Regions:
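Conserved catalytic core of the tyrosine transesterase superfamily
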Residues: 1-316
Length: 316
């Protein structure tokens, strides 16, 4: 066990001293039990150890999960420094330890359907004839819905956060390479994500027909791709400029799909789908994660269902 390197790794990801101490302690107990070198440890070894904690030490799932977290950190450290080719803790999770309510994870097809339904209902077939609005209010509402369709498209296809969507600039779009730059921040890296073919037309329409009209409502010239309207321009805080727009879009999506919660749910779905189609490393880049351990949290997990299959393929 590379204790010194492990501690340095955990310090680099800002874990608390007591947490580091616990992870070292639990990892030591694992190696004392399995009696193998780092590179020799396999998934069945981890599963067998977790079964030992359950059957011999009579530990509850919560404490077994703590051991698994420690081991996952250690093998992630070895994976990132190139010592091992695969983390044996990938896809493992103790059943019954997650107390958070699980929300729906959308498939790529379901995300596309969510966008199509929004576009048909609120853009293409939207009827405001029954609205007793002034003409300029109807124009603003139409512009907002066209803009929100583009926002939703970026959420669904690029997996961006709300803050990242605010920061996209005109120069971040490369039509020749069919890519868009997503600007990160303190916690996320910059990355270039491919544009889907269906997004090209949406972007062209927005840039040629919608954004110029939105620009008329701005007090200064802007390089931002997404522009706000008077209802949100009046806010005194820049970080609140799009809150009204995002909240309105959430409300509209909830009216379409009762299982829709928020945009974090969409991002979680997108990253989960990337892992399945692109692999863990590429998904890490596309999500903007600085550490592979962050991406690993999106892996589909269920330890108890895996044990029998692993036993059949890799006998202890």
């Amino acid at each position: 066990m590379n204790k010194t390197g492990f501690i340095a790794y955990m310090e680099s990801i800002d874990l608390a001293p007591k947490t580091i101490e616990k992870h070292v302690k639990f990892t030591k107990q694992f190696f004392a039990r399995v009696k193998k070198e780092d590179i020799q440890v396999t998934k069945p070894d981890v599963l067998k150890f977790l079964e030992y904690l359950k059957n011999s030490r009579k530990l509850e799932n919560k404490y077994r999960s703590d051991f698994l977290v420690s081991l996952n950190h250690y093998f992630t450290f070895l994976y990132e420094e190139g010592t091992i080719a695969e983390n044996p803790c990938w896809f493992l999770k103790i059943q019954g330890t997650n107390k958070k309510k699980l929300h729906k994870i959308y498939t790529p097809e379901e995300l596309d359907q969510l966008f199509d339904n929004y576009y048909l209902l609120f853009v293409r077939n939207y009827d405001d004839s029954g609205k007793h609005w002034r003409e300029h209010s109807k124009i603003q509402a139409k512009l907002a819905k066209e803009r929100n369709a583009l926002i939703l498209s970026i959420f669904i296809n690029q997996g961006a956060t709300t803050d990242e969507i605010r920061k996209i600039e005109l120069d971040d779009i490369d039509f020749i390479k069919a890519k868009i730059k997503i600007r990160g921040g303190k916690k996320l890296n910059d990355r270039f994500i491919p544009l889907k073919a269906t997004q090209i037309g949406l972007l062209m329409n927005y840039l040629q027909n919608i954004r110029p009209q939105l620009l008329e409502y701005q007090t200064t010239e802007s390089k931002k791709l997404i522009l706000s309207l008077p209802a949100t321009i009046k806010t005194t805080r820049n970080d609140n400029l799009f809150r009204w727009a995002f909240n309105a879009l959430i409300k509209q999506l909830k009216s379409i799909d009762k299982q829709f919660i928020n945009f974090q749910q969409v991002r979680t779905s997108v990253i989960t789908n990337w892992i399945k189609t692109e692999g863990l490393r590429k998904a890490q880049y596309m999500a903007g994660h600085r550490y592979i351990s962050t991406t690993e949290k999106y892996l589909p997990n269920n330890l108890d269902e895996l044990i029998d299959d692993i036993n059949k393929l890799h006998p202890f």
